[in-house]
Regions:
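Alpha-helical scaffold segments that mediate packing/assembly in large oligomeric complexes
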Residues: 98, 103-110, 117-180, 229
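N-terminal alpha-helical "arm" segments
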Residues: 1-29
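Surface-exposed acidic, glycine-flexible loop patches that form ligand/cofactor-binding
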Residues: 136, 184-189
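Glycine-rich, often proline-containing surface loops adjacent to acidic residues and nearby aromatics
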Residues: 86-101, 152-154, 190-195
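Assembly/oligomerization interface modules of large self-assembling protein complexes
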Residues: 24-89
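Structured alpha-helical segments in the cores of large, soluble enzyme domains
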Residues: 75-85, 170-185
């Protein structure tokens, strides 16, 4: 016997089918990054409402010692604590019972697809805010902008920021900066650039620089080392450009040891309230997830405003 409870389950199943097909489907061209792109935002799961991270200064290089000499002691240090609170993101839409019952899929399915799009857009907008605001108000644990000059725990400073527009020469400057970056103990890390992240307006130029067989923007026939040796992956997002409050000229390099993190407390979940509990014969379909994003340390990252 077909029951009302079964009917309710069918309604939620139909809504979830449309929602998650849209939310999980990536119909963009290759190279478009999202909050779920692990090369850019390292996923970390938590069971708490907040995440506390701190920056560590290691021991530094080993000194040479004599045969029976006392082994020198180096004391690691932890400081610059930063707390990231998990945010809850939620939204709901009303769907008329009659609209659903009459099987007017062209209407309610479009509403649910848009609902899924906005869930993904919210994730991406929030995540790439670390880069949009990386020269100003998005801070590392030391209280400085992500892309700026940082005071090292062991003394001295390290800059991971530039101002020059993206060219083969400036890209090399960024690559060298990553390779020669000093860690908190003042030791050169030797990080290798893996990701080049740009706004859509700079995507074509970035691909020409990194993918051309010969050096881009040049009349000579030298081999393009960015393609033949380095293997940079170029990523873009429409949440980086001026249209989204960012910059069309800014560009970023990331190494494997970068600190951009996606903190996940709860993945996307949906819920449906039956029309019987409304006063206007409507279903209420809701979705929510809990997460946040942070970058605690400058290491493994380089950014240029591209304004010079």
């Amino acid at each position: 016997m077909f029951t009302e409870a079964q009917n309710f389950s069918i309604v939620q199943t139909e809504l979830d089918k449309v929602f998650f097909q849209r939310f999980d489907y990536d119909d963009t061209f290759p190279g478009v990054a999202h909050a779920t792109t692990a090369e850019i935002f390292k996923p970390v799961e938590t069971t708490h409402a907040a995440w506390i991270q701190s920056i560590n200064k290691g021991s530094g290089l080993f000194p040479a010692v004599g045969e029976t000499a006392t082994v020198p002691l180096s004391t690691p240090k932890v400081t610059n604590k930063q707390t990231t609170l998990v945010n809850t993101y939620a939204q709901g839409i009303d769907i008329s019972k009659q609209l659903f019952d009459d099987n007017m899929h062209g209407v309610w399915e479009n509403d649910v697809r848009d609902f899924a799009d906005q869930a993904k857009n919210t994730q991406d907008f929030t995540a790439f805010g670390l880069f949009r605001l990386g020269f100003t108000t998005a801070l590392t644990a030391d209280g400085q902008a992500i892309f700026s000059t940082h005071t090292l725990i062991g003394g001295g400073t390290q800059s991971n920021a530039g101002t020059v527009a993206l060219t083969p020469t400036s890209l090399n400057t960024g690559i060298v900066n990553l390779m020669e970056q000093k860690n908190q103990a003042g030791v050169i890390s030797g990080a290798t650039a893996k990701v080049l992240l740009v706004a859509p307006a700079n995507w074509k130029h970035a691909r020409e620089i990194t993918d051309s067989a010969l050096i881009a923007d040049s009349g000579n026939n030298n081999v393009n080392v960015y393609r033949s040796a380095l293997g940079l992956t170029v990523w873009t997002s429409h949440w980086l450009g001026a249209a989204a409050g960012g910059s069309d000229t800014a560009w970023f390099l990331l190494a494997a040891n970068h600190g951009f993190t996606r903190l996940i407390r709860q993945g996307l979940e949906t819920a449906l309230t039956d029309w019987r509990y409304s006063n206007n014969l409507t279903y209420r379909y809701q979705a929510n997830y809990r997460e946040n994003y942070f970058c605690a340390d400058y290491a493994g990252s380089y950014g240029s405003t591209g304004t010079a």
